[in-house]
Amino acid sequence: MSLDKGTKEEITKKFQLHEKDTGSADVQIAILTEHIAELKEHLKRSPKDQNSRLALLKLVGQRRKLLEYLNSTDTERYKNLITRLNLRK
């Protein structure tokens, strides 16, 4: 299960830092967050799907690493992103 192209483009436009930004930490975290939300919904319907559960854990770890990186490099952007994505704190 992956995000369709239109959804990724929409998220990219919403979180990009400049016009041609497609891979900044902000954009990657936003895309991962959407993918995690979709997987969580899938797991509610299919609780025995262990491959999807492992994929979810992997994505959460990946997002956590990117959030730690963003926090260490630019705390203000980190706090702004956490607020915009309605993540913890």
Curated annotation (Swiss-Prot):
Annotated InterPro entries: Ribosomal_uS15 (IPR000589), Ribosomal_uS15_bac-type (IPR005290), uS15_NS1_RNA-bd_sf (IPR009068)
Keywords annotated in UniProt: Ribonucleoprotein, Ribosomal protein, RNA-binding, rRNA-binding
GO CC list: cytosolic small ribosomal subunit
Pfam families according to UniProt: Ribosomal_S15
Tagged with keyword DNA-binding: no
A single GO molecular function term of this UniProt record: rRNA binding
Annotated GO biological process: translation
Function: One of the primary rRNA binding proteins, it binds directly to 16S rRNA where it helps nucleate assembly of the platform of the 30S subunit by binding and bridging several RNA helices of the 16S rRNA.
Family: Belongs to the universal ribosomal protein uS15 family.
Subunit structure: Part of the 30S ribosomal subunit. Forms a bridge to the 50S subunit in the 70S ribosome, contacting the 23S rRNA.
Protein name: Small ribosomal subunit protein uS15
